[in-house]
């Protein structure tokens, strides 16, 4: 039987690798998805772990010097649906299925959604940084 401490030890090792590798938008998005999805695979509860997962998953994004990925409240159901679809497709963690992030290609829908949510923030930051004509 797998216990949370053992799984979290594996998660921390994977997180540290992806944290170090997050240097641009593409690698930061992949680090975000890997950290977030694997965390909720270990802790699939409706007790606030989604908020914790999103906060922790944004650490590599921030480390790369980028603004955080924010799930808009109106997209929350889509976000939860995609997480559950992934979990349903790859199965729960067990002795036979202990990989934290199996079949990453199954994250394509969530990747597309996260990228679209993030693009809004990236555009706001770019707009704030652009020079303005003073009237």
Model-identified regions with their sequence ranges:
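FIC/Doc superfamily catalytic core
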Residues: 1-135
């Amino acid at each position: 039987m797998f216990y949370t401490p053992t799984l979290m030890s594996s998660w921390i090792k994977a997180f540290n690798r992806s944290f170090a590798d997050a240097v641009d938008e593409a690698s930061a998005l992949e680090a975000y998805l890997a950290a977030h999805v694997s965390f909720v695979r270990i802790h699939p509860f409706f007790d606030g772990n989604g908020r914790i997962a999103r906060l922790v998953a944004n650490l590599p994004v921030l480390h790369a010097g980028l603004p955080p990925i924010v799930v808009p409240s109106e997209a929350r159901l889509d976000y939860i649906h995609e997480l559950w679809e992934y979990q349903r497709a790859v199965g729960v963690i067990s002795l036979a299925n202990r990989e934290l992030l199996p079949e990453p290609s199954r994250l394509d829908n969530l990747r597309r959604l996260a990228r679209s949510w993030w693009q809004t923030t990236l555009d706001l930051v770019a707009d704030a940084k652009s020079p303005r004509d003073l009237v």
